[in-house]
Amino acid sequence: MKKVVVFLTLLLSVVSLSAQNSDPGLSFTEASDLTILGKVFPDTPKPYERMDFERFGGWEKSNVNLLEMSSGIMVCFKTDAPEIYVKPVFKELWKYYPLNYSNRGFDLYIRKDGEWVWAGCTGYWKGVEKENGRVKPLVKHMESGVKECLLYLPTYSKISSLEIGVPQAYSLEEGDNPFRHRICIHGSSFMHGTGASRAGQTVPAFLSRATGFEFCSLGVGGDCMMQPQYANALKEADVDAFVFDAFSNGSDKTVEANLFNFIETIQSAKPGVPIIFMRTIRMENRNFNTRRDDEDTRKIAKAEELMAQALKKYKDVYLIDSNAADLNHDTTSDGTHPSDWGYHIWAESVKGPIIKILKKYGIK
């Protein structure tokens, strides 16, 4: 009898949770059945991960952890609904900076008069067990008419399933790709989006909306040191150009060990494709920390030395400046990573040079 009572209690709990996490007035569509953008490798076996681990190997545990995250992935769809909801199932919710929308939330933009305008966001602040399948609104009380929507997925969490919901009387369908050309942007936690308040406030996101190019993000936390496994995968990427934030992680030793092999591996399969390296930004944690200042000075000097050689040695390789600071140098979120405004400044600082280089290759 006691076992029966326990079973019935558990059953009632499941039914209660199911009722809490569903809405009979909504119709849901799996996001992977819509238009998925922003991925260097679009056809990964798991749609909300950024690497095809079956196709490419040689990964370290830290690589896999970061590449399973959904940073930079966008869902494009159209709807005439006045309300839009999300219903995710997470494999993992990022445990650091738990109240940050970029790490654990969804960020929605809607095109208005030809411009992408922020529309709404929502976050999932509790553990996976409590948040999986929980329906939350992105935006409500919108005017009638079809909206072209762009939804950014969390930067540091891992997603197993994502459903987008609208009231049953309305439609939701695949959107047309609003971007032209595919540009791979691979880099450190700066490109991954650490420090951004929302997933749409990263450098790749800013650049995509500002230029109309599809900047496909492969930001990998503190793990971007031009390692061979990344080069071997990137050389197979179906993209029109590469932009690299390659000198923010690592040290002078990793720059020296990996730079030339990284370029040569990619160019072996992608001759004639532009490869644009961005100089790293000046991190504000150098201001009074002499050890950090010395480490960064040596790394930057080595990058400058070797890039001077690379520009002479290889065709289609470029080096451009980047900046994420205002005049007061007060745009950092934590001493290392920029704030939203800092990332916007960074995107603006590289936008013109990137566009100018791409025009040489008919990419415009």
Regions found by a protein language model. Name each.
Residues 16-182, 351, 356-364:
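N-terminal secretory targeting modules
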Residues 283-321, 364:
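Substrate-gating cap/lid alpha-helix
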Residues 270-275:
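A short helix->loop->beta-strand "cap" motif at the edges of active sites that frequently abuts
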Residues 95-99, 193-201, 297-301:
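Glycine- and acidic-residue-enriched helix-capping/strand-helix junction motifs
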Residues 1-22:
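Bacterial Sec-dependent N-terminal signal peptides
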Residues 180-204:
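Catalytic nucleophile-elbow at a beta strand-turn-alpha helix junction centered on a G-D-S/GDSL motif
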Residues 207, 224-260, 265, 280-287:
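Oxyanion-hole/transition-state-stabilizing segment in secreted/luminal serine hydrolases
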Residues 204-217, 309:
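Short helix-loop-beta junction
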